[in-house]
Amino acid sequence: MKITYLAHASFLIETKSGVKILTDPYDDSVGYTVFELSPNVVLTSHKHFDHGYTGSLKGDYVLVDKEGEFEVKGVKIKGIKTFHDKENGQKRGENIVFVIEDEFCVAHLGDLGHELLEHQLEKMGKVDILLIPVGGVYTIDAKEAFNVAKAVNPRIIIPMHYKTEKLKFDLGKVEEFTKHFEDIEVLNTCEIEINNLPEKQKVMLLKYKG
């Protein structure tokens, strides 16, 4: 499995069989480079400009933007309803957590605004790789993200949705999240290929491509 961190909450995930899955594409108002991609599947956690922009995408793709269980090109995908805030969606609406089931199970939390409830964790099932927002303001903050990561208990944690030099609005820094962990690998690349899981939990901090 290959995972490329484009920027913000957007990743391009390529499964062992070659299926390309794009998560939460953003528009150019965010500050990052917008890429012209040709994915097979696009997952959007909600409709905001920084998570649901599909205008630059090419070719035919399957869009998944709701809760439920889906199978696309042999890849199983679960969408689990959560909220973008701590007020059951009254402030910012719903958010979909996606779990991609392939050789490894990858969970993308979108703009999760609250700590996960027991029934949501049960629906997610076993997660190997967790893509988690950590910057607060519009999502869970660093401490809440630590609590969520502890509850999900994956082998690999990849932070997303935090302040960078290019981002045009304020979020918390990723260091506020990583300081809670002992095993942190800072990578000088936006792309990783995962063939095996580490024996112990590890935070992997990727560079963003955009």
Regions found by a protein language model. Give the residues of each.
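Portal/gating segments that form or line small-molecule/metal binding sites
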Residues: T54-A107
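Binuclear metal-ion centers of metallo-dependent hydrolases, dominated by the metallo-beta-lactamase
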Residues: T4-L6, K91, I156-G210
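Active-site metal-binding motif and surrounding structural segment of the metallo-beta-lactamase
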Residues: D27-E69, E122-L131
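Divalent metal-coordination and catalytic microenvironments
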Residues: I13, V42, I77, D111, ...
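Active-site metal-binding loops of divalent metal-dependent hydrolases
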Residues: P25-D27, H46-K47, T82-H84, G110-H114, ...
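Active-site environment of divalent metal-dependent phosphoester hydrolases
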Residues: D28-G31, K47-G52, H114-L117, V137-D141, ...
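Conserved beta-strand hairpin/beta-sheet module of binuclear metal-dependent hydrolase folds
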Residues: M1-V30, K91-G110, I129
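Active-site-proximal loop/helix segments of hydrolase catalytic cores
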Residues: K86-V152
